[in-house]
């Protein structure tokens, strides 16, 4: 039986956030929601995309190990692909979830070439344009660049930039809070959506969460999918 993306996400949400006594009593969710700071958090919140970091890095008890990735292949996937059903945090992958694509990009995840081939090809072509390459980069080439840009040791690598140079969908940090750029507006990121719109300042330097090459891809015209709260 095919389950559409919204319903499939509901099933995963229920699996992770409701214990055996029923929906009125919440259990501790899995630590699998990704923030723009790369962090893996445990909260009951729906999102638009799932993904992984190259394999499994959780225990049989469905808790995180000391690692936060399995390989450099950090990808962002759609929720429903060919009606596949998965046991979340089963034998093979540590599934992760994102509020939306700008969030995934800020954390350094690129579009998946299997379930999001068209988006991945567009992303690679915009990468080629931005870096003036002779051909679009292959996935491992992008993964090597992004791995260096998204992390410093095991922590998030921040990049200092002028806020006027940032494209839409880029993320910047203000007082340890993530804000997304949308035109002349800053949108405060939360696990449940964007809140607290405020005017975008000008002529200041900020700590940018989105990796530099992804900033270039966004500037070249790649259009990520926003959470609906960004339009409200």
For each of these PLM feature ranges, what is it?
Residues 2, 9-232:
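Mature, structured domains enriched in cysteine- and short glycine motifs
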């Amino acid at each position: 039986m095919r389950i559409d993306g919204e319903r499939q996400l509901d099933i995963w949400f229920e699996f992770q956030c409701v214990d055996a006594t029923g929906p009125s009593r919440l259990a501790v969710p899995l630590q699998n929601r990704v923030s723009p700071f790369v962090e893996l958090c445990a909260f009951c919140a729906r999102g638009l995309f799932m993904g992984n970091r190259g394999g499994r890095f959780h225990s049989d008890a469905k808790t995180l190990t000391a690692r936060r990735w399995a390989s450099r292949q950090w990808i962002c996937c759609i929720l429903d692909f060919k009606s596949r059903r998965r046991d979340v945090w089963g034998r093979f992958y540590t599934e992760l979830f994102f509020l939306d694509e700008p969030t995934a990009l800020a954390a350094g995840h690129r579009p998946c070439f299997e379930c999001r081939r068209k988006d991945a090809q567009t992303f690679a072509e915009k990468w080629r344009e931005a870096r003036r390459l002779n051909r679009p980069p292959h996935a491992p080439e992008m993964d090597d660049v992004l791995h260096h840009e998204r992390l410093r040791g095991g922590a998030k690598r921040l990049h200092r930039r002028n806020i006027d140079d940032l494209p839409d969908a880029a993320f910047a940090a203000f007082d340890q809070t993530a804000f997304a750029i949308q035109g002349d507006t800053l949108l405060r990121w939360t696990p449940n959506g964007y809140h607290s719109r405020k005017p975008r300042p000008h002529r200041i330097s900020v700590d940018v969460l989105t990796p530099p090459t992804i900033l270039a891809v966004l500037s070249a015209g790649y259009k990520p999918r926003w959470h609906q709260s960004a339009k409200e």
